[in-house]
């Protein structure tokens, strides 16, 4: 659906959590056919125990799990470029709908790129590119100038729409002159340039802070198991840099961690940033990679958490890692959901200890552009008509909203009856005391279920291929 005044109507409501009461349940639905878009339903009233014929979802707030940092997507160059192609009014409205907690779906954590990723229409670049054969150990030529065209203006506008918005950032490659093959595509960072690369991070964080964009956290490398220089087909070559767990451990322990501390920066380090498969397969290093880093006490002292992607393995890999390192936060930093089954996938991340969820690529045009990389993205949350420059929202936008508009920063996941991939759920207790339950029905059949809480129940009918969010007051924890 295109952005129109009518489309904004569902945003005109009180804060869902604060408006909840102890005697009733408010709830909202989005359906894959878009007949319902974060549409509020008639209020449900708690009843005494009812028939147990319908499947039950029981909530036990005394059993708790992770505390949430945030939920969001990415403001990578492709998304920023498409936002910049819109009219000023559409750009403001679209960002408001993405990040505003009151007038939008309330994304509060966004992934940025340090230099260029694959999803861009511009030539590949780092912040310290040099002619062949030259080096710059003191980083005298460091510059974020290329980000000033449209990336930084978009980020500033997003932060104006939500001052609580947090940004974390990932590089796809160090500058080519620092690497074994002297190119931004593939290869490895040479150890002699570890000190300079640590300062590269410091300069990036300071430069963005000077523009009013504080960087909450960084990862060392997007998908460090990948070396795209090894691809024979040039189509598959894009910025990348291969690291081992031991190399990243050395870099964090001896260089980046100390450099951030010397600079007086509070930016956090999230290690790994690759798939959650348990064992190494192909380009995927497996859990041995972050285990190597966190098993070194001096490196672990600088690490705030582990970042995972979802392109290989199973989300249960995050739970296995949590069992081994129970005090280390787990961040899901890249994945795409695509449709109602994506709602089940998002729940699986949250039920496997992720304290954050970030999708990847928020807005492409309806031709899948801009994109200089090899991966074709399915339809993004919002697409842009390249002729009219009008944005259109798709189901995934509303699906995200069913989670992100309701689950607050600082929410604690509470125990709820385990579902299945045909009927999934996850529950949280917000800092204001409200309980939030998200339920996904990816099947073609209407589902009836009973929600049980504190000796009372309500019965809910969830339409086919839809997601529901239920909110009620439970008092301050």
PLM features per residue range, with description:
Residues 2-14:
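Bacterial N-terminal signal peptides
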Residues 73, 106, 167, 218, ...:
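Conserved, mostly hydrophobic/aromatic
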